[in-house]
């Protein structure tokens, strides 16, 4: 048996790889094993399976999403632990890049083989490998693997089923504490009986939980005050006293409501206490550091350790330590919506059901808020790791927002035209360009994304040539710019998507709707959205705040916030004047009578225009420039690029006079339908696959064209505007012909022009339908039921899934971070907040 297959078998025996993982399938390749291991998560779990607590998994990033920085950190943690706790020699270890870049996967197999022969591993009773004489480094098998590895592959969620979950441990402690005395159940329970059980469980678990908070205060806080400093007490117990006070009152009102006829006022208690439960925001954001500080104090001081054991004995006969009990409040606040969900299910009266659903929504919102606090704590840990590794950084990285992507690239700039190897960290607000020095990074430049835009450039791309895939990062004023080069086209696409997402977070759609000026903002206190009244989630940059009136809002709610009360009274008039001024400027340009020029050589601001002139004008070959200032004896002209509507200066030797070419014969193309009405297009496309399209000549105006495309079960129509010999569907970009326009949108999503149309032009309507569905259909993905979106949700990251109210989402799994599910809609896959959807919604219609 090949050595890598023996290694796979050993990893399965060690309970690291699932027995059914695709690496075990017939026809599996070694690159699939490399892909499974290269983020370092499973390797760290392997050491813990062989030697419990060998690695503190809180120091491991369990969801690195192929961030090179985080993956390498995980791999190096594995390697150092192999030496320190398993006795492997340095010569037996692979280098971190041998795995991450798959430069020498044979050496990785060699290290795992050496690990399998260590006494610790053999004590587990698992057969080491190789079990027969085999070559430990088969160059034929392992050579060329780096070219087969996919840097853009999505995480295989099933892989992480074998990874320890601290949340699951906390859940077990909670369940043990809340276990109810068994009550005999009737042989056949009615819906009324089930409802009574739900009500009883809500009351009894609340009583037990409030007792637990009281026990922490009575048996741990008070005795430890004589041993610990006030700051230690505050760090460890956070606001437990406040939680106990809130729940003492909550329990009283809960009992009063349950004692009433039919418990019809129960929902009011939960709605009332949603705001009071916001004290959990502080607790949940600090409980992890509280546990860590408790461990440090107990390790450093034997008297404290002994006192903790004594307190535990008095509180619960030693069953639960203080560290165990500190996890319980986090678990409890995440259970209310589950308890109410069961109660809703078994409530028959329509009015009661609707009222309880209001309470359910309130508790779901609270749970999601808590989950986002936990998620942001993980994000802040990542940011801290970045911060500690970057030298010359003069401010907190958290000020730049959430990390988007990081990795190696090549770069050129206005100052330095030769390609330079760099390592970049992209966050919401900035790109940090660094030089890698071993395990640390030297900051070379910080690019503030507020004043930059991204522009694709595929002119020099070659599929088989690495580092030829490039896009531009250009300053709005043209004084500075960068060319960013990537190893593969897929990697470039991934980075471009993250740049676009970051810029859309800075300048979201509807940021200036209704007179507002919304900007990303970190709220110190837990805050509700002005539009939907749901909580803003997380611990930093939770949403947006209007610069003028201070109104808070979710990204997806910006267009629904009531009008701003703080902008100038002549706000609308100013906008109208600006519009009229622009029209007058356009008319003036047309009356000058200057010729149009065609670009034959690109220009991106190098060399820059003379200082007294103004901003440069970006030019691409084929662009048409309408001159506004031009004199034959001057080398610099001013003009408007009709493809982008930008105005600026450029060297006159990059253009020549524009000459209209002969009309194109469109009938040869499989997408061209000739003269056709909307109804005719709908008749053709209605029963075709999503993504099928045609281009038609408009019957009412034969000089105009339109695209008709099937998307999301509907036929959409897009008008193609023509003027000055150019074709466009948006003011941002123009083309010299229909063919160029169609070819561009075959490769680029229409969402850049129409937010709700996230598709390319995929299948020309004249192609046979069988070819149009030759790709694996989206429906072939295994899913576990569906859910209906109850609210809009706007993705903040390329891993998230934007939703519109009413969307039906296929649920792919619920195993991710708490409060987030993975789903598919319209062929797009990503994560979304579970409280924004209603699962099996048909039951509640």
Swiss-Prot record:
GO annotation terms (biological process): G protein-coupled receptor signaling pathway; immune response; integrin-mediated signaling pathway; intracellular signal transduction; natural killer cell activation; natural killer cell mediated cytotoxicity; neutrophil chemotaxis; phagocytosis
CDD domains with a match to the protein in the record: C1_VAV1, CH_VAV1, PH_Vav, RhoGEF, SH2_Vav1, SH3_VAV1_1, SH3_VAV1_2
Residues with PTM Phosphotyrosine: 826, 844
Domain of life: Eukaryota
Tissue specificity annotation: Widely expressed in hematopoietic cells but not in other cell types. Found in the spleen and lung.
Record note on modification: Phosphorylated by FYN. Phosphorylated on tyrosine residues by HCK in response to IFNG and bacterial lipopolysaccharide (LPS).
All copies of domain SH2, residue ranges: 671-765
Renumbered zinc finger spans (Phorbol-ester/DAG-type): 515-564
Domain DH stretches: 194-373
One Gene Ontology cellular component annotation held by this UniProt entry: cytosol
Keywords, comma-separated and alphabetical: Guanine-nucleotide releasing factor, Metal-binding, Phosphoprotein, Proto-oncogene, Repeat, SH2 domain, SH3 domain, Zinc, Zinc-finger
GO terms assigned for molecular function: guanyl-nucleotide exchange factor activity; phosphorylation-dependent protein binding; phosphotyrosine residue binding; zinc ion binding
Residues of the SH3 domain: 592-660, 782-842
Domain Calponin-homology (CH) as annotated: residue spans: 1-119
SUPFAM superfamilies: Calponin-homology domain, CH-domain, DBL homology domain (DH-domain), PH domain-like, SH2 domain, SH3-domain
InterPro entries associated with the record: CAMSAP-like_CH_dom (IPR022613), CH_dom (IPR001715), CH_dom_sf (IPR036872), DBL_dom_sf (IPR035899), DH_dom (IPR000219), GDS_CDC24_CS (IPR001331), PE/DAG-bd (IPR002219), PH-like_dom_sf (IPR011993)
Subunit annotation: Interacts with SHB. Interacts with APS, DOCK2, GRB2, GRB3, DOCK2, SLA, TEC and ZNF655/VIK. Interacts with SIAH2; without leading to its degradation. Associates with BLNK, PLCG1, GRB2 and NCK1 in a B-cell antigen receptor-dependent fashion. Interacts with CBLB; which inhibits tyrosine phosphorylation and down-regulates activity. May interact with CCPG1. Interacts with CLNK. Interacts with THEMIS2. Interacts with NEK3 and this interaction is prolactin-dependent. Interacts with ITK. Interacts with PTK2B/PYK2. Interacts with HCK. Interacts with PTK2B/PYK2. Interacts (via SH2 domain) with SYK.
Role summary: Couples tyrosine kinase signals with the activation of the Rho/Rac GTPases, thus leading to cell differentiation and/or proliferation.
Domains: entry comment: The DH domain is involved in interaction with CCPG1.
Name of the protein in its database record: Proto-oncogene vav
